[in-house]
Amino acid sequence: MDAGCEMDFKQLFGLMRQGDENAIIICEECMNVWAAAIVSYIHAYDPEVVVLGGGIMRSADIILPYINKWVEDRAWTPIDRVHIVLSELGDNAALLGLNYYLTSVKRRRNEKVFKL
C-alpha cells in the first residue's frame, strides 16, 4: 500500500484479503471503531437486532464475524440476545427509509388538512 494514495473501502479490504500488513491494521482499526459504536448502541437502546448495510458490507464475510465476536466479548447482554445481520435492502436502504419517512410526514399533514 502506497502512502498518500486515495483509496476506498473496497480497495482497502481487497488489500487486506491479499495480506497487506498496513491494510490489515487499518481495516482492523476501522472494525474496532464500528464494533465499539455498535456495543454503545446496544447498551443505550437494548435492540434485539442490529442491521448493517451500505457499500462497506460488500466485505460482510470479514466484517460480520469480526463485529459479532467483538459484541459477544464486550456487550453486557445474554449470549445470543442481539443478532447482527446484513441488510437485505442493499445500497438503497437509506433511500427507502427516507421515502417512508417523507410519505408518513405527507400523510400526517394531509390528515390535519382534511380534519379541518
Stretch-by-stretch model annotation:
Residues M1-L116:
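ATP-binding/phosphotransfer module of carbohydrate and carboxylate kinases, centering on a glycine-rich
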